[in-house]
Amino acid sequence: MLLNQGIFAMHIRYSEMKMRAISTLSGLMRHHGTDPREFLNATHQFPELGDMLVHENALRHALMRLGGRKLVFSNAPRHYVEQVLGAMGVRRYFDAVYSIESTRYRPKPSSAGFHVLMRAHKLDPHRCVFVDDMLENLRAAKRLGIATVWVSHGVTKPRYVDVRVASVLELPRHVFRNARG
């Protein structure tokens, strides 16, 4: 999802809320027997989603220029991820979508989800690139041998981040020799 400068701070707060919601879901499942499908359905209802997203035609062009297979790996429920990708007009540029349901409700940064995705697509982690805005997720990917790209306006790049970009539109300019496949 591309975010303009005006809503960047809101995105940071939302990212923090996502991590709390994921922790909340795990706790509700473990301690209260909550049905994760019901929880995720109730917490991911956005009738005005299309109006909430920043649409940039350049995103489609950037995705077309990226080589290799492209997979979406999200902690959100499938219906929401598909809705976002569809509203942005980019679904066709991705080979597969992995949602929290795909990982049996073990969200990033758990390595379990990465393993599910890599097994299903017969991926060598040393030939993959993981792009995310959450450092915890990037750290988990790096531990598995995956090259990492941090989408952030942050200045200090941690050691486990290979490349920092301010926008996903910058991705085609970065070539990863180890990410063919």
Functional labels for PLM-detected ranges:
Residues 1-57, 79:
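N-terminal helical cap/lid subdomain that shapes the substrate entry/recognition surface
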Residues 11-13, 46-50, 68, 101, ...:
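Short, contiguous strand/loop micro-motifs
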Residues 18-21, 32, 70, 74, ...:
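Flexible interhelical turns and helix-capping residues at alpha-helix boundaries
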Residues 50-54, 72, 105:
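Short, surface-exposed alpha-helical recognition segments that flank or form part
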Residues 58-67:
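Catalytic-core regions built around general acid/base machinery
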